[in-house]
């Protein structure tokens, strides 16, 4: 039996109005009712302004500092995972956001493999999602805790990457969308900032990090150009501020320093606006889709292949069983919520609802 290939279709205009053009409105209405899920992890040493930046990005009080308030406070023994969950409402669009903080990262005397709890957390979220997918009677909409973006905070020291940062960026960029930023860049002069950015960009190329956004043949020309413009800015040199100050008679979000005052929304002084627009106005959906179609799909394929191989050889312990066993054990030890109250089974969080200001 031969199958006739479909011929090139001619695009015709219906003689009368049909109404299928309303499908975009139907999709929009359904999505608006459900809301959108976005999960962002912040990684960096204490004192780099991680909580302040997240609150500034979303113009809401989403998280509080989990680091040491003073040198007299004890250092966290291990890297922890703390999740804060909120719902933001802006112009009838609801964004359900999980902010994943990582107190203790890079703060120990011996920071060897301090990124492992982060890698395990990311993989565990993939593993949970896969288990839900493979359930015989799964929910219509699967709760998504997969990490869509990792903001990696680099100290503004003007030096090459430390081995800790090299290893962490390498491991994390293999499994998630990593966006490096220069924290508290207002501590640098514009010339120092420019030189430091060039140094870090050369370091990224040297170590071949898989930094987001990625190249793709599926992109339109304008999307490809936008990504090139963004890559030229990475790492974003930023400063965050949750307060308003007066500059030239105008109230703006900014910070006062010993050199004067900085308006964080002035692109000549700070790249905060570029980072905000990138994360929320141009690439929010792509971050979510890339997580699902690239990082999760890679994880899923490996796990299903391991399951198949394990089924054909009952005496062999599959990589899936190893990953799940190790990650679940670590989850119970490392993952605490911001209130310190135990919460089962895999990770713990606090929840809240806020309207974006």
UniProtKB/Swiss-Prot annotation:
One Pfam family matching this protein: Septin
Residues annotated as binding GTP: 44-51, 78, 104, 184-192, 240, 255
Span list, region G4 motif: 183-186
MF term (GO), any: structural constituent of cytoskeleton
Key words, A-Z: Cell cycle, Cell division, GTP-binding, Nucleotide-binding
Lineage: superkingdom: Eukaryota
GO biological process: adhesion of symbiont to host; chitin localization; chlamydospore formation; cytoskeleton-dependent cytokinesis; exit from mitosis; fungal-type cell wall organization; growth of unicellular organism as a thread of attached cells; hyphal growth
Subcellular location(s) of the protein: Bud neck
A GO cellular-component term linked to this record: microtubule cytoskeleton
Main location: other
Region (G3 motif) residue spans: 101-104
InterPro entries cross-referenced by the UniProt entry: G_SEPTIN_dom (IPR030379), P-loop_NTPase (IPR027417), Septin (IPR016491)
Domain Septin-type G: from-to ranges: 34-306
Disordered, as annotated region: 310-357
Family: Belongs to the TRAFAC class TrmE-Era-EngA-EngB-Septin-like GTPase superfamily. Septin GTPase family.
Identification of the protein by name: Cell division control protein 10
Source organism: Candida albicans (strain SC5314 / ATCC MYA-2876)
Gene name, Swiss-Prot/TrEMBL: CDC10
């Amino acid at each position: 039996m031969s199958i006739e290939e479909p011929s090139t279709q001619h695009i015709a205009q219906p003689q009368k109005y049909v109404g299928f053009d309303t499908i975009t409105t139907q999709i929009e209405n359904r999505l608006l009712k459900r809301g959108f899920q976005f999960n962002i992890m912040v990684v960096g040493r204490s004192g780099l302004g991680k909580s302040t930046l997240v609150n500034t990005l979303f113009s809401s009080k989403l998280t509080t500092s989990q680091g040491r308030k003073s040198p007299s406070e004890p250092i966290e023994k291990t890297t922890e995972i703390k999740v804060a969950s909120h719902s933001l409402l802006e112009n009838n669009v609801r964004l359900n956001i999980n902010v994943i903080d990582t107190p203790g990262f890079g703060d120990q005397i011996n920071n060897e493999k301090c990124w492992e709890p982060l890698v395990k957390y990311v993989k565990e979220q993939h593993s949970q999602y896969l288990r839900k997918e493979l359930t015989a009677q799964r929910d219509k909409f699967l709760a998504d805790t997969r990490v869509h973006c990792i903001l990696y905070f680099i100290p503004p020291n003007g030096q090459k990457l430390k081995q800790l940062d090299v290893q962490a960026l390498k491991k994390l960029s293999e499994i998630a969308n990593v966006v490096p930023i220069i924290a508290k860049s207002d501590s640098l002069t514009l010339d120092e900032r420019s030189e430091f950015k060039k140094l870090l960009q050369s370091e990224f190329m040297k170590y071949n990090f898989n930094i987001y956004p990625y190249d793709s043949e599926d992109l339109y020309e304008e999307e490809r150009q936008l990504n090139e413009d963004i890559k030229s800015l990475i790492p974003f040199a930023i400063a965050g501020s949750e307060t308003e100050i007066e500059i030239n008679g105008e109230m703006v979000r900014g910070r006062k320093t010993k050199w004067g005052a900085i308006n964080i929304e002035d692109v000549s002084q700070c790249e905060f606006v570029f980072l905000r627009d990138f994360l929320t106005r141009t690439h929010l959906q792509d971050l979510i889709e890339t997580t699902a179609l690239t990082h999760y799909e890679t994880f899923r394929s490996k796990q299903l292949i391991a399951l198949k191989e394990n089924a054909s050889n009952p005496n062999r312990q599959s990589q899936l069983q190893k990953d799940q066993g190790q990650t679940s054990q670590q989850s119970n030890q490392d993952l605490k919520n911001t209130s310190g109250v135990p919460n089962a089974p895999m990770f713990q969080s606090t929840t809240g609802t806020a309207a974006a200001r």
